[in-house]
Amino acid sequence: MLKPERMVRVSVVGPREKLGETADLLHRLNLVHIEEPEESEYFRIGEPHPDASVVSRALVQMRSFISHLKLDPSRIVPRRKFRESEIEAQLKEKLDEYQQLIGERIEYLRSVDEKIASLQEQLNQIEPLKRLGIPARLLKGYKTLRVFVGFVKENPTEKFAQVTSDFEVFATEYEKELVVAVFVKAEYGDEFLRILQECGYREIQVPDVEDFEAKISEIEKEIESLKSRKEQVEKEIEEVKVKEAETLLAIEEYLSSQMDKYELPLRTLVSKYSFVLVGYLPAKALNEFKAKMDANGVAVEVLDEEGEPPTKLSNPAGVRNFELLTTTFGIPKYKEIDPTVFIAIFFPIFFGMMLGDIGYGLLVTVISLYLKRVFKTEGWQRMLNIGVYAGVMSIIFGFIYGECFGPFIVPGEYEPYQIHFIGSQLEHLYEFHHGHPIFDRVEEMGVKILLFATIVIGIAKILFGFALGFYNVYVEHGLKDAILEKLSWIIGVLGLAMIIFGFAYNVGVFYQLGMGPNPGDVPPLPLPGLMEGWQAGLNVYYLAALPLLVVWFILFVMGEVPKMGAMGVILAVELLTWFGQIMSYARLLAIGLSSVYIAFVINFIGMKLIDPVGISIPIVGAIVLLIGHVGNLILGILDPGLQSLRLHYVEFFTKFFEGGGRLYEPFGRIKRFIEE
């Protein structure tokens, strides 16, 4: 779970005449991640199966049909699986049938669309001319006159007048543009054309039409007729889709599988008599794989690793959903720790801490469960499962905080029923806790405690990240590099933590938690003699920070100076970055409080509008509550989700996770519509 699944590198060697059978078996087993081959003196990359081009054309044809029909395999649950022999027997017949039922109709629809576009273009030419009110026969056919008809961005009349007064301009507006017809003696034609071009002239070709009105009516009727026929053909295609969807997808899956197998020689080295391919497979499947290959007359040999093996993530079902978030950031290298389990634990907790509302959490859960029924692809299913986990954690934290569409207890002289539309019911729910939340994050003490808790979480998470980084570097480069690169920062962050705890000790956080003395009895500086009263007690946290920071600096210099020289010492300021990242965890409090106060304001305004004692506008109040909480819910999903991701990607992953691996992609496919 913490490491990708162990892989072994194998070679598969056999007689060349068995390559086809081996391709079938490899595809069926769906185990071997095949490596790209490198040619040698005696082995060359093979050639695809002779039928590959035929299958390729058929596959392109089927995918074209499926694309046009907008068939989504992930959203179709097959009523039965088709046997491969059944598909093979009727393949030619079905391809011809679908070409007639779908292909020819698609071509017809394309021709109809082209005709409609052509007719629409004619309309676009004729309608502006109709607006001018000049018959087509008067707009062309002159020997001594030049006629210009088209669109312009500005009226050119004044510019024409500077050339000659012997011209006529007819102009009118059409769809926010100016349409003009210009008549001028031929001798001024070139000059007028230049002026028109300066005015943004776009010519309109004048068609041979006697009556614009009649022609427009004729074209519109023809367009309507074509659209009607198009709708009829689309209905016919839809009927084929409903009836043949599963068969279409089964044939596409069969052809895709055949294409994979026919192209396997391109990933295989062949000689005159034999073939060899190299790849990786899970170590636990090696014995079974060898047995099946031996039975097929093909040898399997385990090879030494070369380069980086592919990564096959190995996580339990619940954790597997969060692989989506891990691989979005990067794919773990083969020998790296897989951080998926940590993001599976902490992402929902952080989301719940920030949103922390029973009502919002319930909506997130219900919406995610509903969308799982709509979006069936693996990616959507995983993301929506994460939404369910996050929603459940929000409900749990919401119960702890005592919030359901906002708080029902706030500082001030307000009764729950005055500030919340179900305030009385919530107060009754918490009778076991004297009508108050288990933990109130709105009141002053709750804010201080939660702020301190988030900083402690930040310290622990960053230290844990560096500990994982220590392991990764130790595995890759050895103990010395791990100590200089990661242990040094663990010690440095511990020093920072002592300073933060010392400050909290001084300002009385521990005192308020019942874990320390009154801050008035604690000197702000750790060294005796610097101020009166030091004998009352020393701040042990500051004292502990000093040796930790000294040890950190020594290890840091030992690690950086050999690599970068004296300039490497300057990088010690990076310790302040870790301080900023520790404080960044305070967003677990800040984001949540912003959502709480927005919900409080929405409820307060809504209840004031509904309250019969004041200005009673119940409908407006209900609208305020509805729109306000919908908007706050959207913010409550986006902000905690993004901020929780950021705390993992930036503050946590960067301490140990390099990424850059490549996913395990075995040769073969999981078949949903066909079976052997």
Swiss-Prot record:
The chain crosses the membrane at residues 341-361, 390-410, 449-469, 490-510, 538-558, 564-584, 590-610, 617-637. One of its GO terms (molecular function) is proton-transporting ATPase activity, rotational mechanism. GO terms for biological process: vacuolar acidification. InterPro entries: V-ATPase_116kDa_su. Its main location: membrane. GO terms for cellular component: plasma membrane; proton-transporting V-type ATPase, V0 domain; vacuolar proton-transporting V-type ATPase complex. The keyword Chloroplast does not apply. It is a multi-pass membrane protein. It is found in: Cell membrane. Gene3D superfamilies: 1.20.1460.20, 3.30.70.2170, 3.30.70.2750. Keywords: Cell membrane, Hydrogen ion transport, Ion transport, Membrane, Transmembrane, Transmembrane helix, Transport. It comes from the Archaea. The keyword Transmembrane applies. NCBIfam families: PRK05771.2-4. Belongs to the V-ATPase 116 kDa subunit family. Has multiple subunits with at least A(3), B(3), C, D, E, F, H, I and proteolipid K(x). Component of the A-type ATP synthase that produces ATP from ADP in the presence of a proton gradient across the membrane. This is A-type ATP synthase subunit I. The gene is atpI.
